[in-house]
C-alpha cells in the first residue's frame, strides 16, 4: 500500500494555467485541475477534520505505533518489488525486517529492525515498472488518491490488489483497518499540508512538479540520470 493515498488527501487547488505555460508532462491539465478541486473539497470537509480529531484524541506515541504496524505490513511487497527490480539484497533486507518486527516488534508496533541496522525501503509496482523502462505517460490526478501518472496508476492498482490487508476477514475488520491507515496517514501529514498552503502560489503546479521529481528520484534510488534537454 502506497502513501499516494495520503498525497491525494493533501491536494489543494490552484488557478488554471495559460496555454503558453502548459507542461508537456501534463496534457490533461484541464481534467486534472477539476479532479484536484474535488479532492480539495473532500480534504477540507471530510479528511482533514477527521484527521484533526484523531490527532487530538490519540497521543503521538500511539499514532506512531499504528504507523509502524502498517509500515511493517508494507515491507512484504516492498521486498517483492525489490526482487522484481533485481535488488536481491534489498529484498532479503525487507523480508528480514518483516520477520523481526512481526515477532520481536510485537506485530510491527515497534520498529526493532531499524535498531538492528535493517534499512527501511520505499518501493512499489509503479517504481518497478519505471525500472523496467516503462515510460510514465501523462500526469494524472486520481479521485481521492491524488497525484499519479498512467504508469503509476497501473502500479497503484496492483499495489492494492496484492495488499495484505485485502485478505483480512471479516470484511468489517478489513475496512476498519483501511480506514485507520488512511486517517493515521492523513493526521501525520497535517503539518506538511499547512506548509504547502503557506508556501505555494499555485499549489497544483507545486504539487505536480514535486510529485514527478520525487517519483523519478525514487525509481533511481535517489540518483536519477540527467534528463535530456530538448
PLM region spans:
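Membrane interface segments of multi-pass transport proteins and intramembrane proteases
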Residues: 45, 50-61
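Beta-rich strand-turn-strand
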Residues: 67-69
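A small/polar active-site loop signature that marks catalytic segments
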Residues: 64
